[in-house]
């Protein structure tokens, strides 16, 4: 889809490999085997890369409950909150589960639990919306998160007390 190349290339585009490799931080050990980047996918330099990857979709998506679980949905910019988080981490080489099966429930059991006072950009934050842990996003700092929301698609939203998501934040923070 040539019209998508300006947005960082989509799977199947000529520039896809280059677009993905700019986020890859893996190394090769002395024995010649690949190693996993240290520091995980969030709360580190990789956390900033996850945010940068996610920000490329701001204004280019729409929220569809259950969306983002097929390549055609992704190509069309249809995501829900959990599929967006999965997509952003996938862009930096962090696998948080299969494309077809990601939910807030599968994301909340992964990674390391972090005290909300210790949140860093790239950490994953959860909200009690229509159910416990019903919404998820990526913390960007300054009490804000990047997520795919119903009215905005992918956007940055406030977690300040007194705002919708600020009042729904349940304190669950995970670092992948």
Question: What are these model-derived regions, one by one?
Answer:
Residues 126-127:
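A generic structural signal for residues embedded in beta-strands
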Residues 62-121, 155-157, 166-170:
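Catalytic cysteine-centered active-site loop
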Residues 56, 65, 147, 158, ...:
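Structural signal for conserved beta-strand scaffold positions within catalytic alpha/beta enzyme cores
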């Amino acid at each position: 889809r040539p019209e998508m190349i300006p947005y960082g290339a989509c799977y199947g585009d000529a520039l896809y490999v280059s677009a993905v490799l700019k986020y890859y931080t893996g190394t090769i050990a002395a024995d010649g085997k690949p190693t996993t980047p240290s520091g995980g996918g969030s709360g580190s330099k990789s956390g900033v890369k996850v945010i940068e990857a996610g920000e490329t979709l701001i204004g280019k998506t729409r929220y569809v409950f259950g969306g983002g679980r097929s390549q055609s949905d992704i190509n069309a910019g249809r995501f829900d909150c959990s599929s967006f988080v999965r997509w952003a981490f996938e862009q930096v080489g962090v696998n948080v589960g299969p494309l077809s099966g990601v939910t807030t429930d599968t994301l909340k059991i992964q990674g390391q639990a972090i005290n909300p006072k210790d949140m860093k950009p790239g950490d994953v934050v959860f909200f009690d919306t229509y159910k416990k842990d019903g919404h998820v996003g990526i913390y960007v700092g300054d009490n804000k998160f990047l997520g795919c929301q119903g009215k905005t698609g992918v956007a940055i939203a406030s977690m300040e007390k007194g705002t919708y998501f600020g009042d729904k934040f349940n304190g669950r923070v995970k670092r992948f």
